[in-house]
């Protein structure tokens, strides 16, 4: 079966400061959120400001590859 060309796609947002800093010593992971975006309205990579429980603050979460 061929891949569907849906307009809305599921994406994963990952904390950019956790990835850049290599995660704090006491934290156990990297913050990730799953959401959807409209491929026609937002063709570029999505970046949203979300709360990171590992950094304990609001940081920019960027779209990553699946």
Swiss-Prot record:
GO terms for molecular function: structural constituent of ribosome. Keywords: Chloroplast, Plastid, Ribonucleoprotein, Ribosomal protein. Pfam families: Ribosomal_L33 (PF00471). It is found in: Plastid, Chloroplast. GO terms for biological process: translation. The keyword Ribosomal protein applies. One of its GO terms (cellular component) is ribosome. Disulfide bonds: none annotated. InterPro entries: Ribosomal_bL33 (IPR001705), Ribosomal_bL33_CS (IPR018264), Ribosomal_bL33_sf (IPR038584), Ribosomal_zn-bd (IPR011332). The keyword Chloroplast applies. Belongs to the bacterial ribosomal protein bL33 family. PANTHER family: 50S RIBOSOMAL PROTEIN L33, CHLOROPLASTIC (PTHR43168), LARGE RIBOSOMAL SUBUNIT PROTEIN BL33C (PTHR43168:SF2). This is Large ribosomal subunit protein bL33c. It comes from Gossypium hirsutum.
């Amino acid at each position: 079966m061929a891949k569907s060309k849906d307009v809305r796609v599921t994406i994963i947002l990952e904390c950019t400061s956790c990835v850049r800093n290599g995660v704090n010593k006491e934290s156990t992971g990297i913050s990730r959120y799953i959401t959807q975006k409209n491929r026609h309205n937002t063709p570029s990579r999505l970046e949203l400001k979300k709360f990171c429980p590992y950094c304990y603050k609001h940081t920019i979460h960027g779209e990553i590859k699946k």
